[in-house]
Amino acid sequence: MKVISILGSTGSIGRSTLSVVELHPDKFSIFALSCFDNTDLLFKQTIKFKPSFIVTKDQFSKKRLKDKLKDTKLDTKVLCGKDGYNFIASHDKVTTVVAAITGSAGLISTIEA
């Protein structure tokens, strides 16, 4: 079983990756998802894939997601910023990182992986 963190799960590459994961639940498990701005889609993805962690860009988005998650039974932890992206990219449980953040924004996290 491959344990995956997706850096940029709300973009086209991230969404395509999740489509493949959904087709092969016996081969893949989602450890973490992340986004920059699209917290509504990230929340929907969290409900569907139940990751251990989600990451967004800042404290405001983090609080918004934490508030939305209170109404669920999920134990997903919400992180934010560079430290959050680096954490999910380099966690020991992760076997595969999908670096789907465009440009230099995802460079440090990709190097951490």
For each feature predicted by the language model, list its residue ranges.
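Glycine-rich nucleotide/cofactor/substrate-binding loop typically near the N-terminus or early
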Residues: 31-83, 89
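N-terminal Rossmann-like dinucleotide-binding module
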Residues: 1-54
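Beta-loop-alpha module in the N-terminal Rossmann-like domain of NAD(P)-dependent dehydrogenases
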Residues: 80-112
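Hydrophobic/aromatic ligand-binding patch that stacks against planar heteroaromatic rings
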Residues: 45, 112-113
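Short glycine-/acidic-enriched loop or helix-start segments at secondary-structure transitions
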Residues: 16-17, 42, 65-66, 107-110
